[in-house]
């Protein structure tokens, strides 16, 4: 068995490729079942965010397993192999484990150290458990990754003042406003007519950062108006006007700055729509949805400026240097957590031998106990029989404790295999199985 991950991220693929591979929660079960149905894949879980799609698996054979996952991604995206392959990465075993730890800690994020990725890894664990696509190996790995992410944020400075995709989007708007005025600095949004389209987690973070940046008010649109009103209630100090998504045209006609973050599969704003509107001002669109909510052709419309998640690099690079130093602190934690998981994985090699040893001793115990009880006669009470049986089981457990502990302890693989062979020979057990 082998741990493997195949995927792509903001580091390897532009948003126009990433959006084709995005797997929304409503189709996650189908995707997991499809992958789990492949005889090469024993366990699987999927991490799908605006900046990455990564499929973590336990496979029978690394090359064949990775090939099966790549085939699935090609079918899911509709992209030809030659168009998709250059954007994919894959890691096997210890590299896959180390990569997941980095992802959960936020060290592989566009915004270094951002906290939202940890929530997304938790969601990956929850969906994998709900849809029963994970077994003991991935459960252990992903649970430890979540713990690692928490540990990095509590034991290092990386989580201090960490920014997110949403906060970077707000800063990008401030930067573009400043550049439009001939200043390469962040400008206040106080005079902007701002709208947020969508009422999910990203929109919540947008409202949080807009309020912190001094925004004077926001128009909040959502398909379900009630959800928008529920969200706005959490920001009593920020004037929020809630509207249904049907009022999108009005929003685009009156606002000067519009953020979009919906779960729509197709763009909700394109050039043909904007050309029909009588706009009152210059319109700046910032789209943090994946798939994208804003069609790429809007840049052809006069008086319209559009940015997507890939454009966040411009603002993120301005404050990454200090965070790079903080990331070095986190690397120590990641190396330790990766080592701990791999030691646990190596210890699994001893499990078949331990189980056979326990079964052998249990059979001997049961046989000898039965012989002894048969000689006790009818005067031996049921209570006394239970006491003797418990005594015999306790003796077996005491005998097994030290050898089992030693077989599971961290050690070089050749030494462990030699110990397993000795135990198997002494107790006439079957040879231990090799664990890849």
From Swiss-Prot:
Q: By its UniProt entry, which HAMAP family does this protein fall under?
A: Glu_tRNA_reductase
Q: What does this protein do?
A: Catalyzes the NADPH-dependent reduction of glutamyl-tRNA(Glu) to glutamate 1-semialdehyde (GSA).
| Annotated site, Important for activity, chain positions | 99
Q: Which PROSITE patterns match?
A: GLUTR
Mention any additional remark: During catalysis, the active site Cys acts as a nucleophile attacking the alpha-carbonyl group of tRNA-bound glutamate with the formation of a thioester intermediate between enzyme and glutamate, and the concomitant release of tRNA(Glu). The thioester intermediate is finally reduced by direct hydride transfer from NADPH, to form the product GSA.
The reaction(s) annotated as catalysed by this protein in its Swiss-Prot or TrEMBL entry are: (S)-4-amino-5-oxopentanoate + tRNA(Glu) + NADP(+) = L-glutamyl-tRNA(Glu) + NADPH + H(+)
Classification via InterPro entries: 4pyrrol_synth_GluRdtase (IPR000343), 4pyrrol_synth_GluRdtase_dimer (IPR015896), 4pyrrol_synth_GluRdtase_N (IPR015895), GluRdtase_CS (IPR018214), GluRdtase_dimer_dom_sf (IPR036453), GluRdtase_N_sf (IPR036343), NAD(P)-bd_dom_sf (IPR036291), Shikm_DH/Glu-tRNA_Rdtase (IPR006151)
UniProt cross-references to CDD domains, sorted A to Z: NAD_bind_Glutamyl_tRNA_reduct
Relay the domain remarks.
Answer: Possesses an unusual extended V-shaped dimeric structure with each monomer consisting of three distinct domains arranged along a curved 'spinal' alpha-helix. The N-terminal catalytic domain specifically recognizes the glutamate moiety of the substrate. The second domain is the NADPH-binding domain, and the third C-terminal domain is responsible for dimerization.
Keywords, sorted A to Z: Chlorophyll biosynthesis, NADP, Oxidoreductase, Porphyrin biosynthesis
What is the species listed in this Swiss-Prot or TrEMBL entry? Prochlorococcus marinus (strain MIT 9313)
Q: Which residues does the annotation say bind substrate?
A: 49-52, 109, 114-116, 120
Q: Name one GO biological process term.
A: protoporphyrinogen IX biosynthetic process
What does the similarity note say? Belongs to the glutamyl-tRNA reductase family.
Glycosyltransferase: is it a keyword of this entry? no
Query: Catalytic center at which residues?
Result: 50 (nucleophile)
Q: What is its EC number?
A: 1.2.1.70
Q: Name one GO molecular function term.
A: NADP binding
Question: What top-level branch of life does the organism fall under?
Answer: Bacteria
Please name the top-level EC class of this enzyme: oxidoreductase
Pathway membership: Porphyrin-containing compound metabolism; protoporphyrin-IX biosynthesis; 5-aminolevulinate from L-glutamyl-tRNA(Glu): step 1/2; Porphyrin-containing compound metabolism; chlorophyll biosynthesis
Q: In its UniProt entry, what is this protein called?
A: Glutamyl-tRNA reductase
Q: State how it assembles.
A: Homodimer.
Could you tell me which PANTHER family the record lists for this protein?
A: GLUTAMYL-TRNA REDUCTASE 1, CHLOROPLASTIC
Query: Cystine bridges: which residues?
Result: none
